[in-house]
Amino acid sequence: TSMILLIDPHLGNFRAVMDGAYITNMRTGAQTAVALKYMYGKGKNIHLGLYGAGMQGHTQTMAIAELFDITEVTVYDVSRAAAERYAEDMKPFVKGRINIASDPRDAANGDIAVCVTQSKEEFFKYEWFRPGTILFPMGSYQECSDECIEKADKIVVDHVGQALHRGALAKHGSSGR
């Protein structure tokens, strides 16, 4: 969670105190969309594989839909009810089908795979990848297997220090790999 404080720069008094969760979620979604624009090429059709149907799953989809036509989404969440809510909420942003996966492997068939879960276990396996798939492991813990990271063609981060401190690369950074 976060808090946004708006302070008058001339007088130094508070103008507003706001919950920062929404803007943080939107920013994180935008990071993926902008990175994808440069890695994949703007304007292409996308089949999105999504792990995590919470607020981050929503904002990731919304941001990607700003730059790409999402022709299909396959979403996996440990809570089927959350995946069903996501599917209903995201209809305006997706130009095609929204599939709810009952097995995490089923969401790995997209052009991109976005992991936005709170899982502390490595559940995304390297062998699930299709050649050319772009993986965005956005969670605070390591959602993808070591092999996903070690066999990646490229690893792109927005902030090296933060990437080595938490998320998919933390274990690799702390062990010097």
Question: Positions of the model-derived regions?
Answer:
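Short acidic low-complexity segments
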Residues: V94-G110, F124-K125
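NAD(P)-binding Rossmann-fold cofactor-contacting core
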Residues: L67-M90
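N-terminal ligand-binding/catalytic initiation module
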Residues: T1-N25, A33
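Glycine-rich Rossmann-fold phosphate-binding loop(s) that bind the pyrophosphate
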Residues: G52-G54
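Adenosine-phosphate binding glycine-rich loop
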Residues: C148-R177
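N-terminal Rossmann-fold NAD(P) dinucleotide-binding loop
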Residues: G57-H58
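Rossmann-fold NAD(P) dinucleotide-binding segment
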Residues: G110-I112, S119-M138, D146-E147
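Short helix-loop-beta connector
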Residues: Y40-H47, D69, R130-P131
